[in-house]
Amino acid sequence: MKKSLVLKASVAVATLVPMLSFAAEGDDPAKAAFDSLQASATEYIGYAWAMVVVIVGATIGIKLFKKFTSKAS
């Protein structure tokens, strides 16, 4: 019983180790695609922050304009 369990475990390890090392080698197209997606997302986040600054600045400007025009009237 114990030998059978050890034999099964060693066979499982012997089949998994080459598969894991094969998966770690070479250029992975999925990794390249994910890296490209991550670069695009970073670029879009930069654009979004620029838009946030513009929108917040415009909102503050409009509120200040309304405040000063109501006091001037």
From Swiss-Prot:
Belongs to the inovirus capsid protein family. Residues 66-73 are cytoplasmic. The keyword ATP-binding does not apply. It comes from Enterobacteria phage fd. Its main location: virion. The keyword Transmembrane helix applies. Keywords: Capsid protein, Helical capsid protein, Host membrane, Membrane, Signal, Transmembrane, Transmembrane helix, Virion. Gene3D superfamilies: 1.20.5.80. Residues 1-23 form the signal peptide. Residues 24-44 are periplasmic. It is found in: Virion; Host membrane. Homomultimerizes. There are several thousands of this protein in the phage capsid. The gene is VIII. It comes from the Viruses. Pfam families: Phage_coatGP8 (PF19199). Self assembles to form a helical capsid wrapping up the viral genomic DNA. The capsid displays a filamentous structure with a length of 760-1950 nm and a width of 6-8 nm. The virion assembly and budding take place at the host inner membrane. This is Capsid protein G8P. It is a single-pass type I membrane protein.
